[in-house]
Amino acid sequence: MSDKVVTRFAPSPTGYLHIGGARTALFNWLYAKHTGGTMLLRIEDTDRERSTAAATAAILDGLSWLGLGWDGDAVSQFERAPRHREVAEELVRMGKAYYSYETPAELEAMREAARAKGLPPRYNGQWRDRTPSEAPAGVKGAIRIKAPTEGETIVHDRVQGEVRFPNKDLDDFIILRSDGNPTYMHAVVVDDHDMGVTHIIRGDDHLTNAARQTVIYNAMGWDVPSMSHIPLIHGADGAKLSKRHGALGVEAYRAMGYLPEALLNYLARLGWSHGDDEIMSIKDMISWFDIGDVNKGAARFDFAKLEAINGAHMRRMADAQLLDIFIATLPYLEGGPAMAARLNEHNKAQLLAALPGLKERAKTLVELVDGAAFLFATRPLPVDEKAALLLNDGARKILRGAHEALNALSGDWTAAAAEAAVRDYALAGGHKLGAVAQPLRAALTGKSTSPGVFDVLAVLGREESLARIADQID
């Protein structure tokens, strides 16, 4: 086996790239990057009834959006079926596997007999020492591995530790069906060996498969890759992750306005940590990650924590970089396509200028769309219910004075100049600053919350600001 680390991510294209699969891909990718190795991608599309091209495209799109690139071309497991058959037949020639010729009815009777005795349903090995010459006419044979019947099969797992499986519990399982198609258990081993995979990192729901796959490795005389079975993700209530907990495709998280780097940061910390470090860059994660540091216990998914991490990433990101990501994500966000359709160089510059204030109040890009909506609004500005309460008759009277003070401003129209003018007006009129700033905010944005009102004035510019205020006092 190569000294260079080779990991692989091997999803089944029967649906979207769900959040658990994304974390598995991330751990494989991080470990490969951390060790200077490579991560391969294999599409396990042997289930022809459920595998779809649309699901494959969704998985590739999800990985690309997250920035989890793979090395080389994606491999189709289905297209490697001839190689899987070749290895199964080689095992028969080596005496490590054999043909069995039971009919479905015979297999069901075997299972019923085991259940009647209170035993788990297992194949009884009746064709283990017989030859194909004894095969009944018209029955196609399946190939079964000759599993060891004594001792233990040991899986040396870097997360779960040493896991022992009594060989008496491993029956002679099928590796090639009677129709000539390989089983998943067999195809995975052949593919991992041929692709040079040195480290298998996957969910711990595959742990029981590891023993049977080890039997195939040993039968072929192949090195068994290092195995790491990571804990599954549960909901915040400790129950198995479901859609109500967040078991969604990564495209749903893009539509909810999460940054790829923030989502990766959050997923990395589901089962792994680095001291007290909570907010991590991709560079940090690559530098610090080691699969041996992953916990055994199930991790709990918490949307509130994800939002907090996403907000932290937005605030620490350079404004120009955040703007680029925001614009690229607009087609996927609620209200985003309409905003994207109105983008031009002028309001892009306004948006960039407003970002320092906007990102302080937003935890997601969806909230950023909502916060930035005032920049794209057309006059007369729609005013929401809370903002309307700030525009009563007394407030409109104060607005008239504020409009006059701002209109009298000479020189550059800046946040500092606007603030000085409004403060002077408030002081001269005996008003508290908030009594002036709140109706100003409502008039300028149509909302009761926004970035600092003086920043809003600066971003909108003199002409638009004065016009919006005038709309509320005329």
From Swiss-Prot:
It is an enzyme of class 6 (ligase). A motif ('KMSKS' region) lies at residues 240-244. InterPro entries: aa-tRNA-synth_I_cd-bd, aa-tRNA-synth_I_codon-bd_sub2, aa-tRNA-synth_I_CS, aa_tRNA-synth_I_cd-bd_sf, Glu-tRNA-ligase_bac/mito, Glu/Gln-tRNA-synth, Glu/Gln-tRNA-synth_Ib_cat-dom, GluQ/Sye. Its main location: cytoplasm. It catalyses: tRNA(Glu) + L-glutamate + ATP = L-glutamyl-tRNA(Glu) + AMP + diphosphate. Its EC number is 6.1.1.17. The keyword Ligase applies. The keyword Calcium does not apply. ATP binds at K243. One of its GO terms (biological process) is glutamyl-tRNA aminoacylation. A motif ('HIGH' region) lies at residues 11-21. It is found in: Cytoplasm. SUPFAM superfamilies: An anticodon-binding domain of class I aminoacyl-tRNA synthetases (SSF48163), Nucleotidylyl transferase (SSF52374). PANTHER family: GLUTAMATE--TRNA LIGASE (PTHR43311), GLUTAMATE--TRNA LIGASE, MITOCHONDRIAL-RELATED (PTHR43311:SF2). Catalyzes the attachment of glutamate to tRNA(Glu) in a two-step reaction: glutamate is first activated by ATP to form Glu-AMP and then transferred to the acceptor end of tRNA(Glu). Belongs to the class-I aminoacyl-tRNA synthetase family. Glutamate--tRNA ligase type 1 subfamily. This is Glutamate--tRNA ligase 1. It comes from Mesorhizobium japonicum (strain LMG 29417 / CECT 9101 / MAFF 303099) (Mesorhizobium loti (strain MAFF 303099)).
